[in-house]
Amino acid sequence: MSLPARYYTKTFEDNGATIRILWVDTAPMIDKYRNESETYPDACKQDYQQQLSWIDSVLTAAKEDWVIVAGHHPIYAETPKDESERADMQARLDPILRKHKVDMYICGHIHNFQHVRVAGSDIDYITNSAGSLARKVKPIEGTVFCSPEPGFSIVSASKKTLELRMIDKKGNVLHTVTRSK
């Protein structure tokens, strides 16, 4: 199975609620990836400004009960990886998400669970763990929850609530993020 495009959107219905999810290609938004064309040949070929315009237009038209944006790289998270990655995401993608009051931004990349809330934003920034390799994590400013456990997350919704459950490899719910309207 292949993805429909490098970035795309789909609407789901769950329990009478509608959820719009945008999957975005974050590597081209990060200078490090665009500038290292031999290591990351695809990132430098992409027009990230065109993608940001598309994201803005899709979010402008979004009428669903809940909106989630999913990408590979974190906007806010604790990680030993290069700080410039998050700085680029904060400068490029985050202002659009805040403008449109997105409910959640979900990412991976750093292989642990994190739930971060930052001052001035109502977005829940979620880092999902990995099914195998997991990495150590420590709280940063805005951390609501963090865990190095391997696992996965499940999202469910109703008209009044959006819920994301972080589940470890044994099936235990480690943390629940609940948004209400």
Description of each model-found segment:
Residues 158, 167-168:
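C-terminal domain-closing interface element
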Residues 171-173:
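Residue-level signal for glycine
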Residues 62-79:
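Short acidic, glycine-rich surface-loop motifs adjacent to enzyme active sites
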Residues 26, 70-74, 109-110, 167:
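Short, well-ordered beta-to-alpha junction loops that form the rim of enzyme active sites
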Residues 1-63, 83-88, 92-104, 112-162:
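Extended active-site neighborhood of metal-dependent phosphoesterases/phosphodiesterases
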